[in-house]
Amino acid sequence: MNTGNSSIMRFFHLKLNIFLILSFLIFGFLFWHFAKEMLIVEKDGLYVGQVNLYGDLVLHLSFINKFLESGKILPDSPIFAQSKINYPIFADFTTAQIAKLTSVDFALFITTFLTGLLVIYVARIFILNFIKREKVVFLTLLIFFLNGGFGFIYFFQDYANSQKSITDFLFSMPNEYTDIKEKGYWWINSFLAYFLPQRGFLFAFPITLTILALLYTGFKKNKSYLIIIAGLLSGVLPLVHAHSLFLIFLVSLIYFPLSVMFSKEPERKNIIISWAIFAALTALLSIPIIKTISQDTNPLHFIRLDPGWTSKENIILFWGKNLGIFAPILTVALVWVYKNNKKLFSLYLPFAAIFIISNIFVFQPWEFDNSKLLIYWYFASSIIVAYFMYEFFFSEGLVHKTLGVVLIFFMVFASFLDIFRTFTPVTSYQIFSKEDIAIANSVKFLTNKNGTFVTAPIQNHPIPALSGRSTLVGYHGWLWTHGIDYTNRAQDVKKIYAGENFENLISKYRISYVTVGPHETNDFTINQKNLANYPRIILSQNWSLYDVSNIWANGNGQN
């Protein structure tokens, strides 16, 4: 009898953990798939397997190669020479250390894949703190990783207009269906918009969830050491992801008065002291780090009123189509959770507030970057929706289960299409040619690694991205989103190429090399007669450098 019961218990335990296996199998496989597409080395150049990597990965390559070539923990910015790096360095610094022993493409792969597994693991532990069901964990991850709205409608339109068979069309889809900005779809799949291109977020997400879990458990069980660990982790977040630190700040700012207000009198003093310890540790660590890596820019300068996030239409319509049926289900789920689990509802309130705040104010130059806060709101909301779906649909009879499957299908269908598309040839994008790689290698061999270059400010310029050298003014879009005022330098670069006030500007910025290649020829009017007065380094038929360091180095030029 006991043996029989033991066998039955083992069977149900195994059945329960199928969802644990599925969580790591499915989402771990997706992280592996995307990790191997981060940087693809082909005979004719370097490729990426996803369009959002086209711009973002080039920026990360600039930082990674700067760490590799400079040998410094805190080099100057590769895209704004002689200035602080002005960017969270942890992800790219870590990748660079692995690349020293292997290669950049492998380092990108292994850090993405292993950190992706950590994301799954930490997210699972976080969810189980509040809802101890593996099925809810799996549903949460499914909804979160495959977020999407009603963009799939355009899939059917595109298919109808394609005159192709369904198989041919699936393997040549012309568009993404969570990212259709011209039609107001901005809530992009979380893999494609966050975990892949935003490497800082990839590393910060599990750290942030750990901090929140430590705070929750620390206050719940009155464990001061957990609060201290949370404070230490929060304090180093500026090295990883600035918006995640801001998220912690907002959650704490909202939850602190709530925790004090609803605590009993004997506990109130300890709660206030614990929050003070957490805040003090965070500030003591984070403020010096921010001052060390960031330029002297006041972040409050960027905060502005901008209702509706990126919407150019009615905000309810905007979020309705971007979230799809997730929106009404979340509304119903919140009412249900309020009635059935008030504690969970109260824990959700700070994230609801963050959603509201992020739809009223913009906190950085580019409004889209509010999504770095909204993605945490969506994760919390996914837990609420998954919990409701499990209790209301998947714990009931066949009819309820079937309806639940249908609802989940429409929740994730747009993202499923976008992810499926990444397995097809249409999502291969070349970021650097074979010549670009050769140019970068020549620059490494022929120039001083500490020299400042003048280049065209394009996204995929091989010198700042691949050679580990710094350009006076890099891609304007990156500088703008980082809050850097580049306008004066940009004007000076034009003057340098035109030969205006040439020697004074070269001396002012201590420029070592002026680059003349296809990008510079396209972007500037170049005074070749002026440049002919300086030593020329021929990199290829189309590329040259002019060593101008003697102008300011008193004859001790850097070559």
What are the language-model segments listed below?
Residues 210-218, 250-262, 323-345, 388-391:
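Hydrophobic, aromatic-rich transmembrane alpha-helices
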Residues 393-559:
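Extracytoplasmic
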Residues 192-195, 226-241:
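Membrane-interface alpha helices of multi-pass inner-membrane proteins
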Residues 15, 19-26, 139-143, 232, ...:
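Hydrophobic alpha-helical membrane-interfacial segments at the cytosolic entry of transmembrane helices
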Residues 113-116, 201, 246-249, 366-392:
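Hydrophobic/aromatic-rich transmembrane helices and adjacent perimembrane loops
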Residues 26-207, 242-243, 430, 457:
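Active-site lumenal/periplasmic loops and adjacent helix-entry segments of GT-C-fold
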Residues 55-56, 60-63, 68-69, 257, ...:
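Transmembrane-lumen/periplasm boundary regions of multi-pass, lipid-linked membrane glycan transferases
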Residues 10-18, 217-226, 261-276, 332-352, ...:
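Membrane-interface helix-loop-helix junctions at transmembrane boundaries of multi-pass membrane enzymes
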